[in-house]
Structures are given as structure tokens and as C-alpha cells.
């Protein structure tokens, strides 16, 4: 089945349609490549671009070198220094089904003078990551600059911004001549969700998708702002390749990995077009579990000599093709809109949808963000809407189908008062969010207490939604500090388990008083401060008193934070209500463990890689190693000193065996640290088992 174009809808005058379509595609190109603000979904753009190519194929007299489907990328930004790529950075042509994939192979065979039905091709299969393309230029092994793709010939220098990304080598030993390393900079789905959660709290603009986030972060003039976005990269190609001992694309990937560049674990070596189609089908099934957004696979002819022989069109290689994932959009009905109140007082609208199965799971709700979002989409109860999973995970309403709107559907009236306490709601000028300003609002108290005892904060077991509701309803507590004043008698009167259950809860509360400092910092619920930033603050200041005394400048200087977070933390800790809460927590005996601030150099010169399911969060282990002078990278190379492997370690373990890199389990790491005078570090910080400390997922 062919991918649907729009040729059947074309007007009688093909030139008029061509000119209109050319302008439309060019407009979308500028929005996507130059403004990082796409105006339509990728699949809609693909349909428009395909129709334009079909018109140019049918009417060659229409096309010229300035056609938006014959050029690459967009104009470089004047805000950054331009640089000419030694070899052009191209785009990729697309296919959308197995028939088109076989057609592409026939064209490839024809360009190489081979039989059209040949099945002798070997391919590499790679994921098509939805990020921003970059080019890293090395001369005699030294990184000279990093640049965006730009228009394919001239890009924008973003070296300082790229160097905030983990594992980008600045020096390659023993390499002479010129080398270009190409890849994709991306924002992980988890960091995308965290950014938007903070943006919703602050009322600042949301990112439309992770690709937008990556592009915007990489184009920040201040690299410290880029650092706070936690960008990552996957490198997958070379342009100029002096000194690279590779005859195939697969050998290029292996060489990049050996040099320490981050590469994809999902790439595969494939024999024949049937294997390529099977790889694509497997990636479709797996793509909801990827760390990053991917909108397809890329299939490349493996032989570099055959690549050179096949050559390029004006915009794309003939020897590679992007096989796009199908986009599943489902029609459903917007049954109702409710407005909830979060712990910051934000009024958060939620869409309730007729349940539909999308990509293997039932979807019945979707976030609507704020009043402007509802108004801009003109969403009305009763509307038929198209829903997809953003990034394969988060349900998102894409658009309304106005021709199916009921006659009596009225615009949604956003509440002017808090739906819980009735207090008049407020919306500051320039803020996208509406808030309940009542600090005593039961909904806010409920959410703040739930967050305080949650697993990523103080981790107090046994205090669930029902108990928090009862405690607030009975007037036994008003905030988190009140939890530490509860008696066994009060709890026994509420809990079905009576005295035994009450005793367990009081024991959990008592144990939480001396948990690590970062847990309390996170539990306070400050804007922009989640688990990772709480750990950074704890490491930087050591004690709660140290953090309370810190200046905005000192907080801003903490690696990975920056000015916006510093302002938010300073304002939160200066708030009288926050100071009162902290004082009452301390009066109740909450005295978190101090963090070790002093850096040492016992591990100086050692490079570590972490892999597999570890009993403690990987970020915690990484912080310990770096605090002692070690370096933690993401790829096993000949420079790696130790691979620390948990359960279900994958390809990194095999790679360590190939290179002769020593492998340590967690007991071995603890022994190494003890030998170096760093004490016993093999037990979780708060004495919990791995299952209770949010163990890091397996990573191959």
C-alpha cells in the first residue's frame, strides 16, 4: 500500500497547485529549521513534501535548485558564527512501506549496475533520532569546532554548547588529518517531561516536543543554560575521515564507539532487504520504550566503496533511506474537562476522552495544560478530536474535527474561582497559568503532603492518598510538618490496621528524620527542584543550614543549575511560609544526614562506565566517583579503567571483554573504593535495598 499523497485533491491547473504547495512547504521549512517551531505534525509535512516531489517529477519544467524539497535545512542563524562544512551535510529521502523500500533497493541496484532483484546488499540499520544534526570537526585529533547542519553547506558554530553534552571527546589520540563526526543532539523523553512540568509550574512556554527542546537548548547563547537542559547525543557517521580504518558503515560505528563517542545500542548489521524490513518492524514495536523520540529507521548501504559509487542527489545520498514509522492517530470524543489544583495552586485542566486503544494501551485522559491551550485549539465538550501518543508515551490531542462538532457545543469557560476552596483565582500578566492563591486550599495541602512523603522525596511508606485525605479532613494536620506531631492514638483511630499499622507509620516517620539531605530538599517542593537538582544542591552545600545561607550567586555556580533555578530556590527559601515549615520540621527532630562536600583526588585519572541494573541510582554512584576525582563516561573504550556492571549488563560487558577492560560488580567497586581510602560505599545511602532506591534500569 502506497503512502497517501494529495494528488487526488490537486486542482486542474498543476502549476497553480505546484506554486501554492511550494510556498507552503518553504514556510514549514523555515518554521522547522530556522525557528525551531514546527507548525504542523511531521506526517502532514511528509505528505506535502511528497506531493511536491511528485509534481516536480511529473513536470520537470516546474523545478529549480531553490525548490524546498531539493535543498537541505534552513539558513544559518545570524546570532552564531557561520562555518563551512568541509563536506556537505545532506538530508535523507523517505519511504513509508515495504513496497517502497524494495523500490528503493531496485534504484540502488540500478545505480550500481547490479541486477534489480539482487539480495546481496548488506545494510546497517539505525534509529532516526528526532533531534538536531551536528558536525564535529577534528584536526590532528583536536576538536576545532562543533556546528549545526544549517543549510547543509554552512552551519552555526555551537562548540561551547556541544561540550556540555556528556562523552563528547575533545581529543582523539594518534589521529592525523581531518575528521568530521556527525550525529544527532537530543533531549530525552524524561528530561522533556521534567522541563515541561517545571514550565507549567512557572507559567512559561511549554516545549512542543523533544526536538524543539534540543534545538532551542543548543542555540542558547549561554552554554550554562544549555547545560541545565541535560542534552545528549548519538554519533553515527563521518564526513572527512582521514585516518579512520573503516571499509564499512558498521566499522565506522564500531570505531566511533571505541574512540569514546556515544553511539546507539539499537543499530544492527543486516543482510538483505528482508532483514532490513524485519529490523524496521521490530523497531516499530520497541519505539515506545526508547529513551528518545525516533520517527523511523535509517537503512544505509554498508560498503563505503559502494556508497561512493552510488553517490548523491542534490539533497540526499542514494545509498541511504529513512523508513518512517507509521503515526497512529485515533478519533475519540472529548466527554468532559475537569480542572484540578496542584501543590503550587496551579489550576490544571484535564481532558476526559472516550476510551480508545492507541499503540497497545487504552487512552482515556489527556492534559490540556492551561486556559490558553484550550482556547487556541477551540476545544469544546462533545468535540471529536484526533489523539496520538507524544513520543510514543504521553496522550496528546492533536486537533479538533470541526465538521463533526455537535450543534450545541459551547466554548469551555475556564473557572474564575478555585474549584476546591472557592477562592478567586489569579493569573499574572504574561503568565500562561491560573492559580489559586489561597495557601490553606485543601487541594494544595493534599498535593504538597503527598509529594513530601513520595518515593522520590522522604519516602515514607504507609501514608497514601486516603490517609492524607482523612488527616486533613479531621484537622489533625495542615502541612507536612504536622505529620511528625501525630500520635499512635490519632493514627489508630483512622487506620484499619489499628495500633500495629499506626506503629509502622510512626516508625517510618521517625526513620525519615535522618534520611539524606537531598530527600528533604526535594520534599520541600521548590519549583525547578526535582531529585537530580536536589542532589546537586546537597552535594554543593552539605547541610540544610548551608543551603539556607547560600547566596543566589553561590547556587547559580552549582554545576548543572544556573540563574533561573538559583532565583527560584532563593525565592522559595526566603518565603516566610517555607521558613516556618522548615523550622517546625527541625523542631520535630528532622535532621537530615549531612553530605560530603569536600572533593578528593583518590580516583584521579580513572575512567568508569556504569551498566546494567544497579542497586542504587546511577546518578548517585556517578556523583560519588566524580567527587573522588574519577570520570564517568557512557561508552566502553580502550581508555576505560573499569566497567561497573550490574545485572542484565549487555553489549558494554561484551565490549569490555574485547578490549580487556576490568569489570567490577558492586562489591568489587566497594573494595576498590576502600583500597583508595574512600570507605565502604557499597550499601544504599539510606539503608534500603536496590528495589526501594529506584534502581537504575538496565543499560547495554
From Swiss-Prot:
GO BP terms, alphabetized: DNA repair; DNA replication
Enzyme class: ligase
Lineage of the organism: Bacteria, Thermotogati, Deinococcota, Deinococci, Deinococcales
Alphabetical list of Pfam families matching this protein: BRCT, DNA_ligase_aden, DNA_ligase_OB, DNA_ligase_ZBD, HHH_2, HHH_5, Nlig-Ia
Catalytic activity, as annotated: NAD(+) + (deoxyribonucleotide)n-3'-hydroxyl + 5'-phospho-(deoxyribonucleotide)m = (deoxyribonucleotide)n+m + AMP + beta-nicotinamide D-nucleotide
GO terms for cellular component: cytosol
MF-aspect GO terms: DNA ligase (NAD+) activity; metal ion binding
Record flagged with keyword Lipid metabolism: no
SUPFAM superfamilies tied to this protein: BRCT domain (SSF52113), DNA ligase/mRNA capping enzyme, catalytic domain (SSF56091), Nucleic acid-binding proteins (SSF50249), RuvA domain 2-like (SSF47781)
Positions bound to NAD(+): 42-46, 91-92, 126, 149, 184, 300, 324
Keywords: DNA damage, DNA repair, DNA replication, Ligase, Manganese, Metal-binding, NAD, Zinc
Listed cofactors: Mn(2+)
Stored InterPro entries: BRCT_dom, BRCT_dom_sf, DisA/LigA_HHH, DNA_ligase, DNAligase_adenylation, DNAligase_N, NA-bd_OB-fold, NAD_DNA_ligase_OB
EC number, as in UniProt: 6.5.1.2
Domain BRCT: 598-686
Role summary: DNA ligase that catalyzes the formation of phosphodiester linkages between 5'-phosphoryl and 3'-hydroxyl groups in double-stranded DNA using NAD as a coenzyme and as the energy source for the reaction. It is essential for DNA replication and repair of damaged DNA.
Binding residue positions for Zn(2+): 418, 421, 436, 441
Name this polypeptide is given: DNA ligase
Active site per database record: 128
Protein family per UniProt: Belongs to the NAD-dependent DNA ligase family. LigA subfamily.
Amino acid at each position: 500500500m502506497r503512502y497517501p499523497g494529495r494528488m487526488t485533491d490537486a486542482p486542474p491547473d498543476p502549476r497553480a497547485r505546484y506554486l501554492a504547495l511550494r510556498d507552503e512547504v518553504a514556510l514549514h521549512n523555515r518554521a522547522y529549521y530556522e525557528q525551531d517551531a514546527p507548525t504542523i505534525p511531521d506526517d502532514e509535512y511528509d505528505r506535502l513534501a511528497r506531493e511536491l516531489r511528485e509534481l516536480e517529477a511529473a513536470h520537470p519544467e516546474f523545478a529549480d535548485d531553490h525548490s524546498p524539497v531539493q535543498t537541505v535545512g534552513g539558513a544559518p542563524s545570524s546570532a552564531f558564527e557561520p562555518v563551512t562544512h568541509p563536506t556537505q551535510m545532506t538530508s535523507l529521502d523517505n519511504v513509508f512501506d515495504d513496497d517502497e523500500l524494495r523500490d528503493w533497493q531496485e534504484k540502488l541496484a540500478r545505480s550500481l549496475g547490479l541486477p534489480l532483484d539482487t539480495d546481496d546488499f548488506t545494510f546497517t540499520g539505525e534509529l532516526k533520532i528526532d533531534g538536531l544534526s551536528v558536525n564535529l570537526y577534528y584536526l590532528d585529533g583536536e576538536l576545532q569546532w562543533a556546528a549545526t547542519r544549517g543549510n547543509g553547506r554552512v552551519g552555526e558554530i555551537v562548540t561551547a554548547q556541544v561540550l556540555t553534552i556528556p562523552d563528547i571527546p575533545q581529543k582523539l589520540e594518534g589521529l592525523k588529518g581531518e575528521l568530521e563526526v556527525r550525529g544527532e543532539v537530543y533531549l530525552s523523553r524524561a528530561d522533556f517531561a521534567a522541563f515541561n512540568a517545571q514550565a507549567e509550574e512557572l507559567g512559561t512556554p511549554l516545549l512542543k516536543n523533544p526536538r524543539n527542546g534540543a534545538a532551542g537548548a543548543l542555540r542558547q547563547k549561554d552554554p550554562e543554560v544549555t547545560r541545565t537542559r541535560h542534552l545528549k547525543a548519538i554519533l553515527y557517521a563521518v564526513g572527512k575521515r582521514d585516518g579512520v580504518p573503516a571499509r564499512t558503515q558498521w566499522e565506522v560505528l564500531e570505531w566511533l564507539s571505541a574512540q569514546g563517542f556515544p553511539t546507539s545500542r539499537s543499530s544492527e548489521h543486516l543482510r538483505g532487504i528482508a532483514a532490513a524490513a524485519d529490523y524496521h518492524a521490530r523497531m516499530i514495536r520497541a519505539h515506545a520504550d526508547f529513551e528518545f523520540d525516533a520517527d523511523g529507521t535509517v537503512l544505509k548501504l554498508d560498503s563505503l566503496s559502494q556508497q561512493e559509487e552510488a553517490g548523491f542527489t542534490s539533497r540526499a545520498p542514494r545509498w541511504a533511506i529513512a523508513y518512517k514509522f507509521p503515526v497512529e492517530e485515533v478519533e475519540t470524543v472529548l466527554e468532559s474537562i475537569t480542572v484540578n489544583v496542584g501543590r503550587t495552586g496551579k489550576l490544571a485542566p484535564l481532558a476526559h476522552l472516550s476510551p480508545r486503544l492507541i499503540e497497545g494501551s487504552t487512552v482515556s485522559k489527556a492534559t490540556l495544560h492551561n486556559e490558553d491551550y484550550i482556547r487556541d485549539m477551540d476545544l469544546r465538550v462533545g468535540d471529536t478530536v484526533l489523539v496520538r501518543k507524544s513520543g510514543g508515551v504521553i496522550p496528546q490531542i492533536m486537533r479538533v474535527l470541526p465538521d463533526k462538532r455537535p450543534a450545541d457545543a459551547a466554548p469551555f469557560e475556564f473557572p474564575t474561582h478555585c474549584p476546591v476552596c472557592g477562592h478567586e483565582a489569579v493569573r499574572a500578566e504574561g503568565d500562561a497559568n491560573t492559580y489559586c492563591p489561597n495557601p490553606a486550599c485543601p487541594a494544595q495541602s493534599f498535593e504538597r503532603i503527598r509529594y513530601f512523603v513520595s518515593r522520590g522525596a522522604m519516602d515514607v511508606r504507609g501514608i497514601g492518598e486516603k490517609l492524607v485525605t482523612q488527616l486533613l479532613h479531621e484537622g489533625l494536620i495542615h502541612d507536612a510538618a504536622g505529620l511528625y506531631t501525630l500520635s499512635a492514638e490519632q493514627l489508630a483511630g483512622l487506620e484499619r490496621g489499628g495500633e500495629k499499622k499506626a506503629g509502622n507509620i510512626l516508625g517510618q516517620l521517625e526513620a525519615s528524620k535522618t534520611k539524606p539531605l537531598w530527600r528533604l530538599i526535594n520534599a520541600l517542593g521548590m519549583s525547578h527542584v526535582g531529585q537530580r537538582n536536589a542532589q546537586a544542591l546537597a552535594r554543593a552545600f552539605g547541610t540544610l543550614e548551608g543551603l539556607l545561607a547560600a547566596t543566589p550567586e553561590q547556587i547559580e555556580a552549582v554545576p548543572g543549575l544556573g540563574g533561573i533555578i538559583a532565583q527560584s530556590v532563593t525565592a522559595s527559601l526566603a518565603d516566610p511560609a517555607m521558613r516556618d515549615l522548615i523550622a517546625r520540621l527541625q523542631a520535630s527532630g528532622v535532621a537530615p544526614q549531612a553530605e560530603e562536600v569536600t572533593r578528593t583526588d583518590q580516583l584521579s585519572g580513572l575512567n568508569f562506565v556504569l551498566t546494567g541494573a544497579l542497586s542504587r541510582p546511577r546518578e548517585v554512584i556517578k556523583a560519588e566517583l566524580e567527587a573522588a576525582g574519577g570520570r564517568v563516561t557512557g561508552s566502553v573504550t580502550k581508555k576505560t579503567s573499569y566497567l561497573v556492571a550490574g545485572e542484565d549488563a549487555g553489549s558494554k560487558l561484551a565490549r569490555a571483554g574485547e578490549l580487556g577492560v576490568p569489570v567490577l560488580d558492586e562489591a568489587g567497586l566497594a573494595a576498590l573504593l576502600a583500597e583508595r581510602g574512600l570507605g565502604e560505599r557499597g550499601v544504599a545511602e539510606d539503608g534500603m535495598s536496590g528495589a526501594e532506591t529506584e534502581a537504575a534500569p538496565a543499560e547495554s
